[in-house]
Amino acid sequence: MRAMPLSIGTIHFVGIGGIGMSGIAEVLHNLGYSVQGSDIADNYNVARLRTLGIRVEIGHRAENLGEAAVVVISSAVRTDNPEVVAARAALVPVVRRAEMLAELMRLKWSVAVAGTHGKTTTTSMVAALLDGAGFDPTIINGGIINALGTNARLGSGDWMVVEADESDGTFTKLPATIAVVTNMDPEHLDFYGTFEKEREAFDRFVENIPFYGFAALCTDHPEVQALVARADRRIVTYGFNPQADVRAVNVEGDHRGAFYDVQVSERVTGEARTIERVHLPMYGLHNVQNSLAAIAVAINMGIADEQIRASFARFSGVKRRFTRTGESNGVVVIDDYGHHPVEIQAVLKAARMAGSGRTIAVVQPHRYSRLSSLFEEFCTCFNDADAVIVADVYAAGEQPVEGASKEALVEGLRTHGHRNVQALPSPEALAGIVRELAQPGDMVVCLGAGSITGWANRLPAELDALHGISGGTAPAAKAGGT
């Protein structure tokens, strides 16, 4: 991979432990740049970067900058952060994460995956198909790819596959060759203000691709289908509907995942063919749909049908996307990042496909603003759960919003007809509640983008202790999710 044309000195990342920031930092480090950073706490990403030799300070202080020549920040970093203040006082450039990602993308041809849900899994699927076909792509993803143990990799090929984060609008700056849009729901309205502004951002994202590129768009989603009509670029559509250029049919599922045929139709020539019996070792129709995006990209890059089948058959998914953390007394525990009502609904339907018993959902709502703006949707997205346990809202730095609380959601679910809902007094009480509720064959699905992932990973051992089981069962990662 080419480097940037000028020497830029040490690159300092504020919030380097974030999933998006850590991936860019890792690729820059592997390109030979001097990279350092800081974060408010240790985490998996910080530990991984340190093993690579990247210096990471815990806590934000002006002195952390050292000899930094450029500072990279995400939208989560406030303007009064002491490192940002010090950088600006010293006339050190402060750039956003998306701007640095865009500069990396200029060095290769790139596939950028956007959408309010499914980006991370779809990005990893595109990367898996390109990797299986020998493209050796550079990858920057929004989640840990199980096969790599990281969310980023510097490849030797000419292509890069990236997740395009729409949360702060900066994805419109990414110079993609191929754009993917999985779906488009009202989200991040604290930034956009209105859904119309969000639509306009997705329009610009697609319009940014060059005339020789194309956009893969999911026409199962009405907002994305409307985008097809507005786009002035080459379009390849995908989905379950009969009008899609890449369509899944004959979908079946069991404990091994999903099996389906893929019909591929050429709009111009009228030619059609079928990729038969694709096996995706993941649960849920939403993941079949995500795979169609990757197939649409792959076939338009000349990847053979048999290679597509082979790559998907060994696909191992993404961390925190329907990840099995363990089992206790016949009860399986799942950890999933889903925190939007659409994602939660899809994950619970996948749990129905994967399990033989009841589904018990444990949800930690993420952000007061999201719970408030989508309250009605949250009250109706748990119908596939036999029981729901609601934890306190994970604030993510926000102040409480009236009517957006654990108690309000419990009452809202009951008012909307759910038969079995209860509040979680504290994380420490979870194992006891699950022990009383769950029976062998049941599945406990922990949902949320906050600290609930730690609860999900501890829960099997805590249940073992309550059942008097010594040793327990070893966790076995199984992918699914969004």
Curated annotation (Swiss-Prot):
Known EC number: 6.3.2.8
Annotated compartments: Cytoplasm
Pfam families, per database record: Mur_ligase, Mur_ligase_C, Mur_ligase_M
Biochemical pathway: Cell wall biogenesis; peptidoglycan biosynthesis
GO cellular component: cytoplasm
Gene3D superfamilies tied to this protein: Mur ligase, C-terminal domain, Mur-like, catalytic domain, NAD(P)-binding Rossmann-like Domain
GO molecular function: ATP binding; UDP-N-acetylmuramate-L-alanine ligase activity
Domain of life: Bacteria
Enzyme class name: ligase
Listed GO biological process terms: cell division; cell wall organization; peptidoglycan biosynthetic process; regulation of cell shape
Keyword match Ligase: yes
Binding positions for ATP per the UniProt entry: 115-121
UniProtKB keywords: ATP-binding, Cell cycle, Cell division, Cell shape, Cell wall biogenesis/degradation, Cytoplasm, Ligase, Nucleotide-binding, Peptidoglycan synthesis
InterPro entries associated with the record: Mur-like_cat_sf, Mur_ligase_C, Mur_ligase_C_dom_sf, Mur_ligase_cen, Mur_ligase_N, MurCDEF_pg_biosynth, UDP-N-AcMur_Ala_ligase_MurC
Catalysed reactions listed for this entry: UDP-N-acetyl-alpha-D-muramate + L-alanine + ATP = UDP-N-acetyl-alpha-D-muramoyl-L-alanine + ADP + phosphate + H(+)
PANTHER family reported in the protein's UniProt record: UDP-N-ACETYLMURAMATE--L-ALANINE LIGASE, UDP-N-ACETYLMURAMATE--L-ALANINE LIGASE-RELATED
Role played: Cell wall formation.
Family listed: Belongs to the MurCDEF family.
Protein name: UDP-N-acetylmuramate--L-alanine ligase
Lineage start: Bacteria, Pseudomonadati, Pseudomonadota, Alphaproteobacteria, Rhodospirillales
